[in-house]
Amino acid sequence: MTLLILLAALWVFVHVGLSGTRLRDAVVARIGDKAFMASFAIFSLVLIVLLVIAWRSAETTFLWAAPPWLRWILAFAMLPAFVLFMASHKRNPTAVGNRGLGEGPRGIQRVTRHPMLMSFAIWAAIHVIGNGDTAALVFFGTFLITAVAGMPSIDAKLARRHPETWPAFVAKTSILPFAAIAQGRNQLVLSEIGWMPPVVGVILWAAILHFHRSFFGVPVLLF
């Protein structure tokens, strides 16, 4: 468990304390953006492999057990995470490259300006609730913290990089899904999202639901 906690702390530091902060700006100024992104990607990949190994081998204590009815709710609550994740790949100004930032929010950006991180947050929160043991709490809680803290961190980074266009983008979007739409600052345009992201998201959700035991050794639903 100690190794898992140390690796989790390192993951949070790298993805929240470094990426998106002025410390990142200082490192980029020295080695360049491409070198930073390549190093960051490789380091993250290695670290996530180590996290999985540490999680699988950690001693754990069960704090609660999700009842069958709750597991059904959690299973269906995962569906929006898959749809958000798939939709986030269409011209995402808050992702790497910031494509289309000056053009204003479109598609899933009207729902939340951080669709990918929001999908990770939903995924992590559901797995924290559904597992209920200390090792899973540390492992999935790490990604939950990273996703939730990463949203304002990216906001701050983009505010520094794009002071001319970012305020207008923020004024028409929200972190919380559908908040900007509910407040009248934007409107849902389903045609901009298209049919493919939701359909693929549903298919992936159903596939993971069905094969979860085969892939990860644990069934999603208990009958």
Model-derived features with residue positions:
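Hydrophobic transmembrane alpha-helical segments in integral membrane proteins
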Residues: 1-13
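Loop-to-transmembrane boundary segments
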Residues: 107-108, 114-115, 179-201
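Alpha-helical transmembrane segments
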Residues: 3-4, 67-83, 135-147
